[in-house]
Amino acid sequence: MRKPIPPMDLMFFLLESPQSPKHVAAVQVFKKPKNAPDTYLRDLVAAFKAAPVVAPFNYYPHFPRMGMPEWRVQEDMDMDYHVRHSAVPGPGSDEQLMEVIQRLHAGMLDRRRPGWICQ
C-alpha cells in the first residue's frame, strides 16, 4: 500500500533536523496496582509487544528521488524497537524523570521505521 503523506505531516518531516527534532511526546506515570504480582510491569510490556499493530502505526515515510513522499506499510514490525521500558531509580524525583524524558526525546526518530516509540 502506498498513500501520499498529507501536507501537515510532510511539513514536520521537511522542517526536522538533528538540531531541531519535530516529533511530539507524551508522558504517563503509572503506579503498580495493589496486589499486583512482581511480574506486573514485565507482563504489561510483553502484552504491548504482543498486541497487533494496525494502521497508521505500521506506516513509515518513503521519500523517492522522483515523485511525491508517501506512507508505506512496514510488514515486519520490530516490537522490541517500538516498545521499551524506562524508569528512574526508586524512589525517583521529578528532576530525574525530566532528565530521562529529555534524553529520550532529544534525537530524531528513525525514518526507516514507523514513527513511534512507547518507552
Regions of interest found by a model, annotated:
Residues 1-119:
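Non-catalytic N-terminal regions of enzymes
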